[in-house]
C-alpha cells in the first residue's frame, strides 16, 4: 500500500560525508514520505549503509541536514536524539541480538530502557510482537537456537517494540535462502500495510526491491551521490542512464555486440 499523501516525515538536505580526503557522497537531498517503503540501492562502496547510519543518528555528516519533523538530528542534543530514537526502530545485517539473552530479554530491552511500563504489560507487548513476526513460543530461546531467518524476524520484533514511526533495515535478506527471503518480504509488506510504518531499507536483492519498494533511491560510487529516484519498475523500463540500467537489468556493458549478464 503506497502512502496516500506525500507528507515528508524525514527530509535530507544537501548531505555530504567525508572521511579524510575520501568523499563518500556529496550534496544528497531527498524526502522520506510518511507511510512509504523507501529502498536505497547502489553498488558496493557507494555509501548506502553510511547514509543509513547518519539518518539513524549514529554518525555525524561532514555537512548537511536531516530533519525529522523539523528537528535537525545532525545538530540535536543528546536528549533530543534520545527522543528521536524512541520513534525509530533499527535492524542491521547481523540482527544484533545479544547472544547471552533470550529472545524475550532482547525484545524487552528498549521497553525497559525507554518506558516505565510494568512487567506484565511488557510481557504482553513481547508476546504480541513475537506473534506479529510468527515467532510465538520462542520467547525463551537463545539467538543461537534460531535459524538466520528467525533471527532476522526476532530482530524486527525488537525494532518494532516501541511501535516506531520509522523502521530502518540494512540488507534484510542478505545471506538467507530464497524461501526465507520471500517470507521476510511478506512480513515487511504486511507490517507496512497494517501499521502504516514508514520504512527505509538498504538492499541489493532485485526481486525483493520490486516486491516491497514504493520508491527507490540509487547512489553511485563514482558520481559520489544520488543518480536516480523513482518507482523500481519505472526505473527499470524507462531509464537511459547506463549505470541505473546495469543495476536493474543486472547487465554489464555489451562488448563486441554481445549482451552479458551481471553476476552478483
Q: At which residue positions do the language-model features occur?
A:
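The feature captures the beta-strand-to-loop junction immediately N-terminal to the Walker
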Residues: 41-43
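Helix-to-loop junction immediately C-terminal to a conserved catalytic motif
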Residues: 56
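Conserved ABC transporter NBD signature motif
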Residues: 64-72
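Conserved ABC ATPase "signature" region
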Residues: 71-72, 119-138
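Conserved ABC ATPase signature
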Residues: 142-146, 150
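A short, proline-enriched helix->beta-strand linker immediately N-terminal to the Walker B motif
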Residues: 161-165
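Catalytic Walker B motif of ABC-type/P-loop ATPase nucleotide-binding domains
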Residues: 167-170
Amino acid at each position: 500500500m503506497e502512502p496516500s499523501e506525500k507528507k515528508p516525515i524525514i527530509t535530507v538536505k544537501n548531505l555530504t560525508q567525508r572521511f579524510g580526503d575520501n568523499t563518500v557522497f556529496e550534496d544528497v537531498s531527498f524526502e522520506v514520505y510518511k507511510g512509504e517503503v523507501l529502498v536505497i540501492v547502489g553498488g558496493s562502496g557507494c555509501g548506502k549503509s553510511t547514509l543509513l547510519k547518519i539518518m539513524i543518528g549514529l554518525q555525524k555528516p561532514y555537512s548537511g541536514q536531516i530533519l525529522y519533523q523539523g528537528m535537525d538530528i545532525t545538530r540535536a542534543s543528546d536528549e533530543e536524539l534520545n527522543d528521536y530514537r524512541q520513534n525509530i526502530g533499527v535492524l542491521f545485517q547481523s540482527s544484533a541480538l545479544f547472544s547471552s539473552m533470550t529472545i524475550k530479554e532482547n525484545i524487552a530491552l528498549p521497553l525497559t530502557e525507554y518506558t516505565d511500563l510494568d512487567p506484565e504489560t511488557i510481557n504482553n507487548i513481547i508476546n504480541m510482537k513475537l506473534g506479529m513476526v510468527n515467532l510465538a513460543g520462542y520467547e525463551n530461546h537463545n539467538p543461537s537456537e534460531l535459524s538466520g531467518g528467525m533471527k532476522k524476524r526476532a530482530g524486527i520484533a525488537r525494532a518494532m517494540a516501541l511501535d516506531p514511526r520509522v523502521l530502518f533495515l540494512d540488507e534484510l535478506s542478505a545471506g538467507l535462502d530464497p524461501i526465507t527471503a520471500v517470507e521476510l518480504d511478506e512480513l515487511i509488506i504486511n507490517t507496512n500495510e497494517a501499521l502504516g510504518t514508514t520504512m527505509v531499507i538498504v538492499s541489493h536483492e532485485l526481486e525483493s526491491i520490486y516486491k516491497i519498494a514504493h520508491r527507490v533511491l540509487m547512489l553511485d560510487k563514482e558520481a559520489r551521490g544520488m543518480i536516480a529516484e523513482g518507482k523500481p519498475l519505472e526505473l527499470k523500463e524507462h531509464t537511459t542512464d547506463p549505470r541505473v540500467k546495469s543495476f536493474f537489468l543486472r547487465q554489464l556493458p555489451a562488448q563486441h555486440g554481445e549482451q552479458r549478464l551481471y553476476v552478483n
